[in-house]
Structure formats: C-alpha cells, structure tokens
Amino acid sequence: MTSTPTPTPTGALALADGSVFLGHGTGATGIALGEVCFNTAMTGHQEILADPSYAGQVVCFTFPHVGNVGANGEDEEAASPQARKAAVGMIARAKITPPASWRADTTFEEWLCTRGIVALTGIDTRALTRKIREGGMQMCAIAHDAAGNIDIEALKAAAAGAPTMEGRELAADVARTEGGDWTEGNWTLGEGYAVGPEDGPRVVVLDYGVKANILRLLTGAGARVAVLPGKASIDDIKALNPDGVVVSNGPGDPAETGKYALPTIKAVLDANIPTLGICLGHQMLALAIGAKTAKMPQGHHGANHPVKNHETGQVEIVSMNHGFAVDGTTLPANAAETHVSLFDGSNSGFKLTDKPVWAVQHHPEASPGPQDSFGVFDRFVGELKGRVEA
C-alpha cells in the first residue's frame, strides 16, 4: 500500500508492515524511528507533542487542522531540559498555516524544528488511523528531505527493524538528572503563572517524564513541590521529609522502568507515605502491589475519553495517553478499582484499602483536555493537609 500526494513529496512514512505514505515534509529534516499512534484531540497539539510520555512515538492527529495557532512558551509541558525529548514525529492532513492566535510567539513549523520533530502533512490520516485501529500500533520510520531524496526501500527496512515498545525503557531519557524545588503554580489570563506557597504539605514528585502541568496543579492545590529523578533512592526521598509522594507519568514499558523504580516505590509504600500515581506511575504502583500490565493494541490517546468514577458514580471526560494498561483482574484484594474506561472497560484507577495510596491511568492535569479530573490534585493535597494538621 502506497499513498501519494501531489506535487512532489518531500516526506514519507513507512510502516513495519511495508505500507508507505508519501507527503510533504515540515519541521525537522532527517529520519526518525518510532511507534505510530493516533490522537483524537482537536486542540492542544503543542502540549501533546511536548508531553514526555510520547517519547519514542510518532503522533498521527485525526483532526485535520494542526498548528494553525502557532506555539508559545507558556504552554510548555517539558518540566526539565531532558523532558524536551518527547514525540519524534508528527503526521497531519492539512498544511500548517501561519499562526492565527495572539498568544503565539513562533510558528508551529519553527517550533517543530526547535524540538527536532520530523513532521508530514498531506497524509491520508483517516486511512492511517483505520490501519492502526484495525491492526494495532506498529513501528515506523518517518523522513523529511527538502529535495525529496528519500530511499523508500531503506525507510521500509528501517521501520521493519525498529525495536517495539514492549521491553523498552524510555523514562530515563526524559527524566531530570538533578532534583530541585518547583514553584510555578496555576496560569491565569493576564497574570501568567502564580508563585507557589511558602508553606503547606511537602510533596516529592518522582520524575519519569513528568508533565509541567502536574507540578503546577500540585502547587496550585497548596503543596510545596520538590522533584527528584526517577532513579532516586528511598533515602533521597526521606531526606526531604515528604508528606506525600507522586509517581509521575512517563514513556515506555512500565515493566522495564520498574526494574530500577519498583524497589524505591515499594519502600515508599512500606513507609506508609501517602502516594499518588499518574499514568506510568499508576502502572508502576500496580506492579509494586503485585498486579500485571500489558501492551494495548491501539492504546488510548486523546482528550475526549469517558471514564466512570466508581466512587462518585459520575462519568468524567479526561485526557489519556498510554499504550500499556493495568490488568484490573490482577489487582490484589486490598486494591479497589476506582475508575474504568467506558471505551473498552480497561482499568483507569485504583486505591488501596489499607494504605493511603491512589492511582489514575488518565491525565488529570489535562493540558490539553477537559478539567473534569482536576479534583484529583485537590483531594490528594487536601488529604495531606488533614494529616499534617492532625
């Protein structure tokens, strides 16, 4: 299968199954290897591509118009220099137009270049999305050459030989290497980002590729936030006298990251420190208590996913970005399922009944997406405040 646009293509996408899509290259030049997935969000494309959880992936947007609001520094989701290694490629249907937003401080194409993201436009994204939906995510090679000099056969061979996401540890590539305090709070129009509190519960975030908005919302909820590399030890954590710990989002196979992360996470649980896990953090908390994770065929990537909250009985519309999932049937007796995806019934959250531990698979910080789950941060920090004051 080969999909060809006109005029002369300057970019190409080759899938591991031999399929080829020809398009117009933009963003960074060169070749990138990654797992191709589709994202259904209509807005927030800068935040999506800057999410460290997308490290090693090529994002196909189902919404045709991408980047027409440009990019700006305030919407940055990389919480550290290392976290700028996020998505490696982007695929869109329509040509990227000049920015139409007063908030833009650069064009989207320029931003793609600065982030090293190889991008294609003019692709039949509906056909590509159907292929992923029916056959599952697969590895790919994406190329951009301004002169159109692309060796298609070599590109197909590169895609076929690319290592899959299963068994890959990517969190260490996007996690910070040094710890530090985080003081940036919530954003408001005309005011920018607020400054965090000088007192309040101390929250230590283990960084496996944490999104900046997770840190902002923790700060906005009243926590004093410190961030440590994901490879930090329990002694490193205890040295900061935390009232709570957050195990962050991040990319890759949780079982592989867990090889170095689980001993520390288990030690946090053994110390009875209140803990919140998000996305990859949710998966690794599940592994720490004896549950299992598995690769998903298509994954969940978008800003319109319905999740049932069993504790409130309400349906929350949330942002999701994950290619692995917790097998809810393997959760131990002391773990109660709190959230479930209404798309496929997969686990989207649990809590422990004998320890102060909560975990959600979706992204409660959104950015982009609905704000239905912002309360996750308020409840967690509120729980810590109650314990501190008790």
UniProtKB/Swiss-Prot annotation:
Superkingdom is Bacteria
- Which SMART domains does this UniProt record tie to the protein? CPSase_sm_chain
The segment annotated CPSase runs over: 1-198
InterPro entries named in the record: Anth_synth/Amidotransfase, CarbamoylP_synth_ssu, CarbamoylP_synth_ssu_N, CarbP_synth_ssu_N_sf, Class_I_gatase-like, CPSase_GATase1, GATASE
Q: Which GO terms describe its biological process?
A: 'de novo' pyrimidine nucleobase biosynthetic process; 'de novo' UMP biosynthetic process; glutamine metabolic process; L-arginine biosynthetic process
Q: Where is the Glutamine amidotransferase type-1 domain?
A: 202-390
> EC number(s) of the enzyme?
6.3.5.5
Q: Which Pfam families match?
A: CPSase_sm_chain, GATase
Q: Which GO terms describe its molecular function?
A: ATP binding; carbamoyl-phosphate synthase (glutamine-hydrolyzing) activity; glutaminase activity
Fetch the CDD domains from UniProt. GATase1_CPSase
Which residues are noted in the entry as L-glutamine-binding?
53, 250, 252, 280, 283, 321, 323-324
* Keyword line: Amino-acid biosynthesis, Arginine biosynthesis, ATP-binding, Glutamine amidotransferase, Ligase, Nucleotide-binding, Pyrimidine biosynthesis
Q: In which pathway does it act?
A: Amino-acid biosynthesis; L-arginine biosynthesis; carbamoyl phosphate from bicarbonate: step 1/1; Pyrimidine metabolism; UMP biosynthesis via de novo pathway; (S)-dihydroorotate from bicarbonate: step 1/3
Catalytic residues per the record? 279 (nucleophile), 363, 365
Tell me what reaction this enzyme catalyses: hydrogencarbonate + L-glutamine + 2 ATP + H2O = carbamoyl phosphate + L-glutamate + 2 ADP + phosphate + 2 H(+)
Q: Which Gene3D superfamilies has this protein been placed in?
A: 3.40.50.880, Carbamoyl-phosphate synthase small subunit, N-terminal domain
- SUPFAM superfamilies per record: Carbamoyl phosphate synthetase, small subunit N-terminal domain, Class I glutamine amidotransferase-like
The record, for HAMAP family, names: CPSase_S_chain (MF_01209)
Subunit and interaction comment: Composed of two chains; the small (or glutamine) chain promotes the hydrolysis of glutamine to ammonia, which is used by the large (or ammonia) chain to synthesize carbamoyl phosphate. Tetramer of heterodimers (alpha,beta)4.
Similarity comment: Belongs to the CarA family.
Q: What does this protein do?
A: Small subunit of the glutamine-dependent carbamoyl phosphate synthetase (CPSase). CPSase catalyzes the formation of carbamoyl phosphate from the ammonia moiety of glutamine, carbonate, and phosphate donated by ATP, constituting the first step of 2 biosynthetic pathways, one leading to arginine and/or urea and the other to pyrimidine nucleotides. The small subunit (glutamine amidotransferase) binds and cleaves glutamine to supply the large subunit with the substrate ammonia.
- This chain belongs to the protein called Carbamoyl phosphate synthase small chain
